[in-house]
């Protein structure tokens, strides 16, 4: 039986390696860290979370929550590890980031079918291979991808939010509450009056950004847009985004503030909080000056400043099959953000599919296409069937899944039925895969 190569031990690569090893197939898992680090990573652990610590919604009536549940049914290492290291986050699944990546690393390195190779590759190995090197792919391998695909792909930028020392947050001003009181009161909320918001807005739009990037020429994915870029779109833009006050009444007044900045718990000890939606590329001194204008953060200590990364992705509609296999080299699979899926969970899900299909190829079976009615299948279908000319990264969402045969006006009820259909179709599909494996 051939050994499968997996390049990159991020979320997608870790998931792919796990799926392959669980089937009893040997894996060479290549990870260049710590021999060579990237600008975004801080450790040598696998599946390190370089942006937020949130894996977003957990309810199946939300598309990313459904995606997680599908992955649970398929024994995802990423979702198993996230559930095991979860921290309070209302209706979302957020993790204590270091224990999370440490758990993934421990599970993979202790698996007898996985051989870890700490080495930077500049070419594709021979044989069945999953490439999951992420948005910060090293130049040599990036060139190999360009040479294979005949096109350079696209680039965009995303950003990480600051992380704060909880002991320096003013508890006399902030209050604990989740939006609409969903789940436990997991977020700290910094309320703003109109005057406080306007003063903050003016400081934000006039603050200096770090050198090295021309914001006017950037293609920035909406889900990770720097707060200062969002603010420059209009004075009220943030009020409909991360500073939206709806459902966050101040329990001391019973009234809804003009604006609210939310802080999400970042570790199990609750000693760190991150600023929700505050990805930024401001200079570090400016971050301290501007963010201390937020009520409750007057004396806050920033333990990790917001940073910005350059990300790259391929024109998947041109170069990939919905199995995540290359159209030009069928034994070469791609997974993760480089395929145009956007988000932690989406990246891991693509690795799960690529891992299953690499396994099937190693076992002499045909790669499978997941049902489009599932969250996993709809992502694979979208990135390989949408317009290549206008291709942009995509999060999991119900809008890319086939509509129900019956029109339902109530959004929550409609989403519930879409989720029920997805899980039923996944179970049928999974049973069919298992029958093939047993023959």
Curated annotation (Swiss-Prot):
Record's keyword terms, sorted: Cytoplasm, FAD, Flavoprotein, Methyltransferase, NAD, NADP, Transferase, tRNA processing
Reaction catalyzed: uridine(54) in tRNA + (6R)-5,10-methylene-5,6,7,8-tetrahydrofolate + NADH + H(+) = 5-methyluridine(54) in tRNA + (6S)-5,6,7,8-tetrahydrofolate + NAD(+); uridine(54) in tRNA + (6R)-5,10-methylene-5,6,7,8-tetrahydrofolate + NADPH + H(+) = 5-methyluridine(54) in tRNA + (6S)-5,6,7,8-tetrahydrofolate + NADP(+)
EC number: 2.1.1.74
PROSITE patterns tied to this protein: GIDA_2
Domain of life: Bacteria
Location in the cell: Cytoplasm
Residues involved in FAD binding: 8-13
GO cellular-component term (any): cytosol
Names of the cofactor(s): FAD
Xref: InterPro entries: FAD/NAD-bd_sf, MnmG-rel, MnmG-rel_CS, MnmG_N, TrmFO
Top-level class of the enzyme under EC nomenclature: transferase
Gene Ontology BP annotations: tRNA methylation; tRNA wobble uridine modification
Gene Ontology MF: a single term: tRNA (uracil(54)-C5)-methyltransferase activity, 5,10-methylenetetrahydrofolate-dependent
Family of this protein: Belongs to the MnmG family. TrmFO subfamily.
Stored NCBIfam families: gid_trmFO (TIGR00137), PRK05335.1 (NF003739)
Function: Catalyzes the folate-dependent formation of 5-methyl-uridine at position 54 (M-5-U54) in all tRNAs.
Name used for this protein in its record: Methylenetetrahydrofolate--tRNA-(uracil-5-)-methyltransferase TrmFO
Organism: Lacticaseibacillus paracasei (strain ATCC 334 / BCRC 17002 / CCUG 31169 / CIP 107868 / KCTC 3260 / NRRL B-441) (Lactobacillus paracasei)
Lineage of the species this protein comes from: Bacteria, Bacillati, Bacillota, Bacilli, Lactobacillales
